Amino acid sequence: TEYRMYEDVAVVLKEYGYHQYEISNYAKAGCECRHNEGYWQRKDYLGLGLGAASLLGKERFSNTSDMQEYLKNSSAPEKIQKNWELLTREDEMAEFMFLGLRMTQGVSKKEFQEYFGTAIENIYGEVLKKYKKQGLLLEESGRIFLSREGIHVSNAVMADFLL
């Protein structure tokens, strides 16, 4: 089965010195993909070029995918930016959770509290309780993360964090 193959590959990768640092990636220590980590941690990024996406603070947008439009307006960034949205607090909370849970280190309760001004349990208490009880989420050293079993059903778990 796919589950067994996934677990077998994980064993082989570990034997060769790789560690799982996100639910779909392995790397040797110090060689983790910084781009992915920045994305999962919701750090600002600026996409340059045709169709490139950006997240700057609470603003998310992408550049046009139309080459003619892009070339015609490339000196005026506001004319090539499409799909602009201002993220709400709820959007940011949901992204904090479902993007952060993609990393094996999970999410920091302290960082959630500092950024949003409220405890993670005040927003997601029932969801956290449900998945901890099922053994799909674990908590250790102030971090909440997917268990090994939770990784296999991560999409279902993460969907419950959408507000």
Spans of features found by a protein language model:
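C-terminal scaffold of the Radical SAM
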Residues: 1-118
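Short, amphipathic alpha-helical interaction segments positioned at domain boundaries
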Residues: 149-163
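Minor-groove-contacting beta-hairpin "wing" of winged helix-turn-helix DNA-binding domains
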Residues: 143-147
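A short, conserved structural fragment
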Residues: 132-142
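Short amphipathic alpha-helical interaction segments
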Residues: 117-132
